[in-house]
Swiss-Prot record:
It comes from Pan paniscus (Pygmy chimpanzee). It is a multi-pass membrane protein. The chain crosses the membrane at residues 6-26, 68-88, 97-117, 138-158, 164-184, 189-209. The lineage of its organism: Eukaryota, Metazoa, Chordata, Craniata, Vertebrata. It is found in: Mitochondrion inner membrane. This is ATP synthase F(0) complex subunit a. Gene3D superfamilies: ATP synthase, F0 complex, subunit A. Component of the ATP synthase complex composed at least of ATP5F1A/subunit alpha, ATP5F1B/subunit beta, ATP5MC1/subunit c (homooctomer), MT-ATP6/subunit a, MT-ATP8/subunit 8, ATP5ME/subunit e, ATP5MF/subunit f, ATP5MG/subunit g, ATP5MK/subunit k, ATP5MJ/subunit j, ATP5F1C/subunit gamma, ATP5F1D/subunit delta, ATP5F1E/subunit epsilon, ATP5PF/subunit F6, ATP5PB/subunit b, ATP5PD/subunit d, ATP5PO/subunit OSCP.
Length: 226
């Protein structure tokens, strides 16, 4: 029986029960904590990456924006870990589900907008009407800017979903082609398998880049509203 092309994106179950809870709780096990005075190389590397990410995200923010540092660092680690675990064979990638990505994007976007209207009300309202706009275009521009504001969380979620899903589908197709050619032509199989390895390396990079892009855009929205 041929496997459905989108079967890998279906929510998994264990003994008929949803495995989402186990999937969510598993990544923290990959980030060990040390009780020793001197950390080992793994924990030192993790701390260096967290400090580097925090520095990259927080340099542009003021005091109010820096209160989000823990949230943003946790977000990028969660998305990156989830994307990388999804590259394992027969695993499930939650970030291929638009519903999950919207559940991350909408609250974060709404939080930045609420902060903008609370602490910088005039500047937040000024975004709806650029300075120097001709009077006849004012109603149209207000509508356009309002629509663009509400599209931001959708763009965040769709971008992450589309990039991760496209990569997984391409890997699935090339992997299927490798298996199909294995009994027909050995040279063709080696070529396709080499392409599959290169694509896997590329997908690892995409998984990390998409986590960074998602978090960076949230950080930019926060910067605009604080």
């Amino acid at each position: 029986m041929n496997e459905n092309l989108f079967a890998s994106f279906a929510a998994p179950t264990i003994l008929g029960l949803p495995a989402a809870v186990l999937i969510i709780l598993f990544p923290p096990l990959l980030v060990p904590t040390s009780k020793h005075l001197i950390n080992n190389r793994l924990i030192t590397t993790q701390q260096w990456l967290i400090q580097l990410t925090s520095k990259q995200m927080m340099t542009m923010h003021n005091t109010k924006g820096r209160t989000w540092s823990l949230m943003l660092v946790s977000l990028i680690i969660f998305i990156a870990t989830t994307n990388l675990l999804g590259l394992l064979p027969h695993s499930f990638t939650p970030t291929t589900q638009l519903s999950m990505n919207l559940a991350m994007a909408i609250p974060l976007w709404a939080g930045t907008v609420v902060m903008g209207f609370r602490f910088k009300t005039k500047n937040a309202l000024a975004h709806f009407l650029p300075q120097g706009t001709p009077t006849p275009l004012i109603p149209m521009l207000i509508i356009i800017e309002t629509i663009s504001l509400f599209i931001q969380p959708m763009a965040l979620a769709v971008r992450l979903t589309a990039n991760i899903t496209a990569g997984h589908l391409l890997m699935h197709l090339i992997g299927s082609a490798t298996l199909a050619l294995s009994t027909i032509s050995l040279p063709s199989t080696l070529i396709i398998f080499t392409i599959l390895i290169l694509l896997t390396v590329l997908e690892i990079a995409v998984a990390l880049i998409q986590a960074y892009v998602f978090t960076l855009l949230v950080s930019l929205y926060l910067h605009d509203n604080t």
